[in-house]
Protein backbone atom coordinates (compact mmCIF):
# COMPACT_ATOMS: atom_id res chain seq x y z
CA UNK A 1 0.00 0.00 0.00
CA UNK A 2 1.64 3.23 -1.08
CA UNK A 3 -0.24 5.63 1.22
CA UNK A 4 -0.18 3.75 4.55
CA UNK A 5 2.16 1.59 6.62
CA UNK A 6 1.04 -0.93 9.24
CA UNK A 7 3.68 -2.31 11.58
CA UNK A 8 4.09 -4.13 14.87
CA UNK A 9 6.27 -1.74 16.89
CA UNK A 10 9.26 -3.13 18.76
CA UNK A 11 7.82 -1.63 21.97
CA UNK A 12 4.44 -3.39 21.56
CA UNK A 13 2.87 -4.37 24.88
CA UNK A 14 0.08 -6.42 23.28
CA UNK A 15 1.14 -9.41 21.15
CA UNK A 16 -0.49 -8.24 17.91
CA UNK A 17 -0.57 -4.50 18.57
CA UNK A 18 -0.14 -2.49 15.38
CA UNK A 19 0.72 1.07 14.51
CA UNK A 20 -0.93 2.59 11.43
CA UNK A 21 0.90 5.51 9.80
CA UNK A 22 0.37 7.60 6.68
CA UNK A 23 3.47 7.58 4.49
CA UNK A 24 3.54 11.36 4.29
CA UNK A 25 3.56 13.86 7.13
CA UNK A 26 -0.05 14.53 8.15
CA UNK A 27 -1.02 16.20 11.41
CA UNK A 28 -4.84 15.80 11.41
CA UNK A 29 -7.34 13.29 10.01
CA UNK A 30 -9.05 16.10 8.11
CA UNK A 31 -5.80 16.67 6.17
CA UNK A 32 -6.15 13.31 4.39
CA UNK A 33 -6.77 13.48 0.67
CA UNK A 34 -9.71 11.58 -0.79
CA UNK A 35 -7.29 8.99 -2.13
CA UNK A 36 -5.69 8.57 1.33
CA UNK A 37 -9.14 8.20 2.91
CA UNK A 38 -10.06 5.43 0.47
CA UNK A 39 -6.68 3.76 0.97
CA UNK A 40 -7.16 3.97 4.75
CA UNK A 41 -10.51 2.17 4.45
CA UNK A 42 -8.83 -0.58 2.42
CA UNK A 43 -5.89 -0.93 4.82
CA UNK A 44 -8.16 -1.08 7.87
CA UNK A 45 -10.39 -3.66 6.21
CA UNK A 46 -7.38 -5.79 5.34
CA UNK A 47 -5.87 -5.45 8.83
CA UNK A 48 -9.09 -6.31 10.68
CA UNK A 49 -9.83 -9.24 8.37
CA UNK A 50 -6.24 -10.37 8.96
CA UNK A 51 -6.89 -10.42 12.70
CA UNK A 52 -10.05 -12.49 12.08
CA UNK A 53 -8.06 -14.93 9.93
CA UNK A 54 -5.21 -15.13 12.44
CA UNK A 55 -7.55 -16.03 15.31
CA UNK A 56 -10.12 -17.90 13.22
CA UNK A 57 -12.86 -15.79 14.82
CA UNK A 58 -14.29 -12.29 14.84
CA UNK A 59 -11.49 -10.52 16.68
CA UNK A 60 -12.24 -7.75 19.19
CA UNK A 61 -9.94 -4.75 19.17
CA UNK A 62 -9.45 -1.28 20.57
CA UNK A 63 -8.27 1.44 18.20
CA UNK A 64 -7.30 5.02 18.89
CA UNK A 65 -6.09 7.88 16.70
CA UNK A 66 -3.49 10.46 17.72
CA UNK A 67 -3.59 13.70 15.80
CA UNK A 68 -2.25 17.15 16.58
CA UNK A 69 -3.96 18.58 19.68
CA UNK A 70 -5.74 21.42 17.88
CA UNK A 71 -6.58 22.57 14.38
CA UNK A 72 -3.50 24.76 13.97
CA UNK A 73 -0.87 23.47 11.53
CA UNK A 74 1.55 21.16 13.33
CA UNK A 75 4.35 20.08 10.96
CA UNK A 76 6.19 18.43 13.89
CA UNK A 77 3.24 16.08 14.51
CA UNK A 78 2.57 12.75 12.78
CA UNK A 79 -0.97 11.42 12.67
CA UNK A 80 -1.09 7.74 13.65
CA UNK A 81 -3.36 5.06 15.07
CA UNK A 82 -2.85 2.20 17.49
CA UNK A 83 -4.81 -1.04 17.18
CA UNK A 84 -4.89 -3.42 20.14
CA UNK A 85 -6.47 -6.86 19.76
CA UNK A 86 -6.55 -8.42 23.26
CA UNK A 87 -5.91 -11.98 22.09
CA UNK A 88 -2.76 -14.10 22.50
CA UNK A 89 -2.74 -17.42 20.66
CA UNK A 90 -6.42 -18.02 19.88
CA UNK A 91 -9.87 -16.48 20.24
CA UNK A 92 -10.17 -18.13 23.66
CA UNK A 93 -6.84 -16.95 25.11
CA UNK A 94 -6.98 -13.28 26.05
CA UNK A 95 -4.19 -11.01 27.20
CA UNK A 96 -4.79 -9.30 30.54
CA UNK A 97 -2.46 -6.63 31.86
CA UNK A 98 -1.99 -7.20 35.58
CA UNK A 99 0.33 -6.29 38.44
CA UNK A 100 3.89 -6.38 37.18
CA UNK A 101 2.90 -5.52 33.60
CA UNK A 102 0.81 -2.51 34.64
CA UNK A 103 3.56 -1.10 36.83
CA UNK A 104 6.77 -2.20 35.18
CA UNK A 105 7.21 -4.11 31.95
CA UNK A 106 4.97 -6.06 29.61
CA UNK A 107 5.46 -9.82 29.43
CA UNK A 108 5.28 -11.24 25.91
CA UNK A 109 4.41 -14.73 24.74
CA UNK A 110 6.13 -13.94 21.44
CA UNK A 111 8.40 -11.22 20.13
CA UNK A 112 7.03 -8.31 18.10
CA UNK A 113 8.91 -9.72 15.10
CA UNK A 114 7.20 -13.12 15.46
CA UNK A 115 3.82 -11.41 15.86
CA UNK A 116 4.44 -9.34 12.73
CA UNK A 117 5.33 -12.47 10.75
CA UNK A 118 2.17 -14.31 11.88
CA UNK A 119 0.00 -11.28 11.09
CA UNK A 120 1.70 -10.82 7.70
CA UNK A 121 0.87 -14.45 6.84
CA UNK A 122 -2.77 -13.89 7.85
CA UNK A 123 -3.08 -10.89 5.54
Describe the function of each predicted region.
Residues 1-123:
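HIT superfamily nucleotide-processing domains
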Amino acid sequence: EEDWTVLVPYWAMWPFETLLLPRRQIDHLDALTEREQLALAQVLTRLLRGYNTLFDASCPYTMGWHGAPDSAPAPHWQLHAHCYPPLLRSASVRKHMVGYEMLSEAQRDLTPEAAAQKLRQAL
